[in-house]
Amino acid sequence: MAEEHEKGVPMVLAPQMGAIDATVESIRYRAQLIARNQKLDSGVAATGIIGFAAGFLFSLLMVIVLPVAVGL
């Protein structure tokens, strides 16, 4: 009688995992895209003020300092 409990229920059909695997891969791909985009946004936000200051100083150099130095 103990042998009957160890056998379990025989599987009639093999499980169809193709659709589940495709869905899991789709979710994994989307999660990676979201993570990449979030990292990019964080990097841009962290360096935005420095980039703005560098661009402003460069524009002052090009508009004011160089024409005065050249004599225009």
Swiss-Prot record:
It is found in: Cell membrane. It comes from Methanosarcina mazei (strain ATCC BAA-159 / DSM 3647 / Goe1 / Go1 / JCM 11833 / OCM 88) (Methanosarcina frisia). GO terms for molecular function: tetrahydromethanopterin S-methyltransferase activity. The lineage of its organism: Archaea, Methanobacteriati, Methanobacteriota, Stenosarchaea group, Methanomicrobia. Signal peptide: none annotated. Its EC number is 7.2.1.4. It catalyses: 5-methyl-5,6,7,8-tetrahydromethanopterin + coenzyme M + 2 Na(+)(in) = 5,6,7,8-tetrahydromethanopterin + methyl-coenzyme M + 2 Na(+)(out). One of its GO terms (biological process) is methylation. Pathway: One-carbon metabolism; methanogenesis from CO(2); methyl-coenzyme M from 5,10-methylene-5,6,7,8-tetrahydromethanopterin: step 2/2. This is Tetrahydromethanopterin S-methyltransferase subunit F. Part of a complex that catalyzes the formation of methyl-coenzyme M and tetrahydromethanopterin from coenzyme M and methyl-tetrahydromethanopterin. This is an energy-conserving, sodium-ion translocating step. Belongs to the MtrF family. It is an enzyme of class 7 (translocase). The chain crosses the membrane at residues 49-69. It is a single-pass membrane protein. It comes from the Archaea. Keywords: Cell membrane, Membrane, Methanogenesis, Methyltransferase, One-carbon metabolism, Transferase, Translocase, Transmembrane, Transmembrane helix. The complex is composed of 8 subunits; MtrA, MtrB, MtrC, MtrD, MtrE, MtrF, MtrG and MtrH. One of its GO terms (cellular component) is plasma membrane.
